[in-house]
Amino acid sequence: MTNIVIAGYVPGAIGRITELHATYYGSHWDFGLFFESKVASELSEFLRRFDPERDGFWTVIRGGCVEGSLAIDGAQAETEGAHLRWFIVSDAIRGQGAGNRLMEEAVGFCRRKEYPRIFLWTFKGLHPARHLYEKFGFRQVDQVEGEQWGKQVLEQRFVLALR
């Protein structure tokens, strides 16, 4: 974890985070244009309406390059829960603790904001991510066949109750 910094938004973050998602999920899960454009548009929309009193956004920087990210969308935090999104760590630093640090930042942020819960959507087969979610106390509460990422997968909803 030497030379790795956890930061917020930096110029180029939207493009790089989109690239990380598109290349990882494209090569491992055959996700394509629909997924990449969804990440780009939804991340852009989130950052345009970003409110630091409500939302969290963290990047992992190494050598001046974005190598990971995680966001907390707090727009529906009091009703639906805080939405954990765009969690990814590049192959270059995967397994070095950056994902753990991002999760610590996000969960700590939500606790300080006294949000009732954090939720996320993922899909079956992402074992390292699931392990990390469960390490932080998230529990799977739903599983359904779906195509929200442009390809049929077994979507899973995880929730961490905070109060």
Question: What spans do the regions from the language model cover?
Answer:
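Active-site acidic-Proline motif in GNAT/NAT acetyltransferases
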Residues: 90-96, 124-125
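Acetyl-CoA-dependent GNAT
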Residues: 4-92, 100-109, 113, 140-146, ...
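C-terminal "cap" of GNAT-fold acetyltransferases
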Residues: 12, 116-163
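Residues that form or flank phosphate/diphosphate-binding pockets in enzymes
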Residues: 79, 97, 128
